[in-house]
Structure formats: structure tokens, C-alpha cells
Swiss-Prot record:
Record-given protein name: UDP-N-acetylmuramoylalanine--D-glutamate ligase
Pathway(s) per entry: Cell wall biogenesis; peptidoglycan biosynthesis
GO biological process per UniProt: cell division; cell wall organization; peptidoglycan biosynthetic process; regulation of cell shape
Compartment(s): Cytoplasm
Gene designation: murD
PANTHER family per record: UDP-N-ACETYLMURAMOYLALANINE--D-GLUTAMATE LIGASE (PTHR43692:SF1)
Residues that coordinate or bind ATP: G120, S121, N122, G123, K124, S125, T126
A single GO cellular-component term on record: cytoplasm
Amino acid sequence: MLNEPLQPQVAATSVILGLGKTGLSSARFLASRGFSIAVMDSRKSPPGLAALQEQNPDAVLRLGGFDAALIAEAEQLVVSPGVALSEPAILAARARGIPVVGDIELFASYVKAPVIGITGSNGKSTVTSLLEAMARQAGRQVLAGGNLGTPALELLEKPVPDLYILELSSFQLETTYTLDAVAACVLNISPDHMDRYPDLDAYCQAKARIYRGTGTMVINADDFRVASLVQPHRPCLRFTLGMPAVDEYGLQERAGETWLVRGHERLLSARRLPLAGRHNLANALAALALGEAVGLPRAAMLSALQAFSGLPHRCEWLAEVNGVRWYNDSKGTNVGATVAAIEGIPCQGKLILIAGGVGKGADFSPLSKPLIQRARAVVLMGQDASRLEAVLASGPPLYRVNSMDEAVVKANVLAQSGDCVLLSPACASFDMYADFEARGQAFRQAVREILSC
């Protein structure tokens, strides 16, 4: 796990590309360790600018583009997740032999406690937060962050815990080489970020980098892409939504009741989990397997499971009025997440889905079958509403709107008693909102307004 950190060199510079939350944490971390830093961003006014100027007034700053001459003199290039590695400046740096790393690689060079790594197309934040709750219930000192919440490098500024839990994106893993996680999991693979990757295989290969270490591999046996990543002679724990093998986690149906099990041993009835949806049963099983891999007591893990109600904007129940239930799944930013929400939300009647935004080059066709089976109607908005409309034309009725307020009004008119209204856009939010949280908050507010009338 422990690697030899790069030492500052006289007159040498660490160049940081991207001045968002991660880039700012990289700048702060390197400057505090004596590195000379330069920070660049293609934007003229990036979100971390004011904080950088306050915290690191001596940092060299280049905005509105990347300074190729300065990059050519760098001792290392620290690339933020939002910057594609196909950028000409990065390709040129690699051709010169300049190390190209990210914040997680820096973290791996300095970390002094065991690390659990969690990635996947969907469920990362839920499993990270659930596992953190399990570790705390077990009395462990734990710090969680990475792609979720606190940047990884900021965790290193705090007292060393018993355990780090990191949510890791494919973009972060692209520039990570030496992280040796004591346990790691790719939760699932479904198409996402196809505007950044040439194909699904390239995206899968980026996710697979989380297994580069020597620790326990936690494997989703139901996902053939994940299952194919198993390495011989590595410790491995599997989970499935079917009946598991003797040393795996899974589900058992008994007398009309679903149980979480390990092998043939029943652990907990699914009815006792506050989390909604079958996809969250997979998240629970993954967390149990990861917890077992690092020695968390089962009783503590099961106790935490029964108390964990989930995260905002992830299949979040908002209200029930006139027999209609409203769910906020704004974090459903890709097709796989939305399919899981459509199939997993408990609904006596039909679904009214609100979807649309920036599709990131995704194939929307996997939405068709579950919508035909479960939806009364689909309300579309945002940049790629026309693409969604073309793909879903043979399914339930489609309605186009121009705003979240209009979407909620239309859904309220369409819904019947027993139905569920689900915001799960299958798209990113940045055509209309700063992030998925802002989109989810707009949905909440629109629901409040329509229900207060």
C-alpha cells in the first residue's frame, strides 16, 4: 500500500490541470509539502479560483487554456477528473515522459492506513456511505470520501483513521497506478460517459484499475463484465441477487419473503431495510462483502443496514398525496441507473417517468422494455429530449416540457391513485442545472408547490 512519495525538486513544478474541488485539493496538498505548483484551467473563471488565490497566492496560474511550454517543464502533471486524458497537452506531456497522475495516485503515495476502494456505474455513493456507517457501528475510526464528499487528499490532513473508504470514478482511476486497496469492488458496469470513452470496453478497463492491488476482490456475479475481471489466486468474495454459493452473498426467497443470505445462512429480511428497490439489495450485499473483507463484525453491519435510509437524490421518497407517491432519483444520470430505478421502485399502479438532460452519448434503448412494462407515461425535458423521444416512440405516451415546473405539473395531471412519479433522468444535468443536486432540489420544490395547491 505504501509507495515512495515524489520529493520536491529545485526549480521544478507540479502542474495541476483543472481547478474544481479536486484540483484545489491537489494544489493545497502539494503546496503544503513544499512543491512549487502551477494551476491551469481551460475556463477563464473556474470555481476554485478565489480559494486558490487566497490559499496559494504564489501559485502560477494560467486560465482559458493550457500552457504547453510550462507543462513541458513540469516534474509531474496532476490531472483533475474533469479533464480528458486525450487533451493534446496531456498527450504531449506523456510523450516527453512526464508522469501524469491524479489525486488518488498522490493519495496512494502518502496513505498510512488500509483503503477500501469502491467504483461502478451506479451505487458507488450509497455503498460508500453504507459501509462507512457499518464501520462506525463497529467502533472503527473511519474516513470516507474521494469522488463523494471530501476529496481524498483532504482526508490525509486529518488524524490517521483505522480505515479509509474511497468512492472512485473511472476518471480518477485512469490516473491511478499504485493504489493497493485492502478490498475493492466494481459494483456494476453499464454505459456511461460515452462522450469520454471510445467504447464500453475502454470504460470497463478504466473501472477495472481498482483491482490492480493485492487485496480482496468483491465481485458482482450477476454482471458478466465485472465477473470477467476476477484474477486467479486473488482473494475474492462474490454477491448475487440470486441464490448464492456457500461462500457468497445473495438472496433467498422463503415463504414469500426475501432474505439477505451468506450461502444458506439467512442474515436479514429485506423488509427490514429502509432502502427501496432491488438494486439497493445489491448495494447492501456488496457492502456486507466489503465489510467482511476488512473484518467488520456481522452484527454491527446488520444493525447499520437496518438504520441506513439512503442518500438524497437516490430513489428518495418525497411524498404521497391522493395515493400518488413521488420519488427523487436525480442521481440517475445514466441509463443503467434509470433502468434500476424503474424496475426497483415499489409501485402498486404505473410509473410516470420524468427524464432528459445531457445524454453523454448514451444508447437510450435499454429504457424501452421496462417503460413498456411499468410506465403510464414519460415526461421529457432537456437537451436530449428529442433523442429520447425517438428511441421511446413505440412505448407509453410521451410528453415534452421546457422546465421542471412544467414536468411536475404534467406528471401530476397524468398520475392516478396507486401510481408513482419518478424523476430519474438517465442524463446529466448540466444543460439546465449546476449539478444533479440542484436538479433534485428543483424537483423537490416543484413537488412541494404542486402539492400545496
